[in-house]
Amino acid sequence: MRPPLTGSGGGFSGGRGRGGYSGGRGDGGFSGGRGGGGRGGGRGFSDRGGRGRGRGPPRGGARGGRGPAGRGGMKGGSKVIVEPHRHAGVFIAKGKEDALVTKNLVPGEAVYNEKRISVQNEDGTKTEYRVWNPFRSKLAAAILGGVDNIWIKPGAKVLYLGAASGTTVSHVSDLVGPEGCVYAVEFSHRSGRDLVNMAKKRTNVIPIIEDARHPAKYRMLVGMVDVIFSDVAQPDQARILALNASYFLKSGGHFVISIKANCIDSTVPAEAVFQTEVKKLQQEQFKPAEQVTLEPFERDHACVVGGYRMPKKPKAATAA
């Protein structure tokens, strides 16, 4: 067990041990668990090394407010107000700190140890929300970056390429709700295990452990979808998206792609890479509509959103 951090300047507070270490010269020292713990050494985390606190931090974890033990809730306790975001299915929890949240499809269950917030409704029932961390999810970073439309909304059918262990997929599953469906494709078996375990509890997630470069291999599992979200971080990711779109994305559907400049070409500036990728997408019947940077959450990443095989707009008759 990793010793929890104390907030008072010097070192770590130990677990439940007897004495712990008192710091040497450079280490702000560990302060002991239930008893001892000397003073932290000279140049630790704070200038003076600080004094080790006897008993470790309060039970609610290092920072959590008044939430359940171990994983504190939002700061501000019962004063959290949840408001709908302009993207349907996304909410903002306003407490001491504002956070992006989604309504938990499986109340009582966390997927990746994220914070959960329970809000009392007027009729006495409770609704549980899960905090959506933009540092762990490109889609949340794009929403906070001000993307105009993510096209993923309640009832939508989504094909998610590069699902990893299902962190973002779980929030997309919350977003589309019981009427929607998320086909989550992931090639790595290790991440796939977590993905499959998450999907056991979320009936609207269909995990597919397969290479997104070969959509023909899973064509029997996936129906036509409204949106493809792609986060594959491969040099040929535009091609991977186009292949999957040709099989599964309906005409007039939409795509959201997260582009990591470094994994395409690390020798040129990120902006140039994004420009080239957008051109590639345009050649494949995609119509990119907007691009947002994922700074400060991800470095040299951009998110591009647009339509696929969009119907031609009828030309308005010119007035004589």
UniProtKB/Swiss-Prot annotation:
Coiled coil region boundaries: none
GO molecular function annotations of the record: methyltransferase activity; mRNA binding; RNA binding; RNA nuclease activity; snoRNA binding
Enzyme Commission code: 2.1.1.-
Compartmental location: Nucleus, Nucleolus
Record GO biological process: defense response; methylation; rRNA processing
Alphabetical keyword list: Methylation, Methyltransferase, Nucleus, Plant defense, Ribonucleoprotein, RNA-binding, rRNA processing, S-adenosyl-L-methionine, Transferase
Highest rank taxon of the organism: Eukaryota
Uppermost EC category: transferase
Catalyses which reaction(s): a ribonucleotide in rRNA + S-adenosyl-L-methionine = a 2'-O-methylribonucleotide in rRNA + S-adenosyl-L-homocysteine + H(+); L-glutaminyl-[histone H2A] + S-adenosyl-L-methionine = N(5)-methyl-L-glutaminyl-[histone H2A] + S-adenosyl-L-homocysteine + H(+)
One GO cellular component term: mediator complex
Chain positions recorded as S-adenosyl-L-methionine binding sites: T167, T168, E186, F187, D211, A212, D231, V232, A233, Q234
UniProt similarity note: Belongs to the methyltransferase superfamily. Fibrillarin family.
Function: S-adenosyl-L-methionine-dependent methyltransferase that has the ability to methylate both RNAs and proteins. Involved in pre-rRNA processing. Utilizes the methyl donor S-adenosyl-L-methionine to catalyze the site-specific 2'-hydroxyl methylation of ribose moieties in pre-ribosomal RNA. Site specificity is provided by a guide RNA that base pairs with the substrate. Methylation occurs at a characteristic distance from the sequence involved in base pairing with the guide RNA.
Name assigned to this protein: rRNA 2'-O-methyltransferase fibrillarin 2
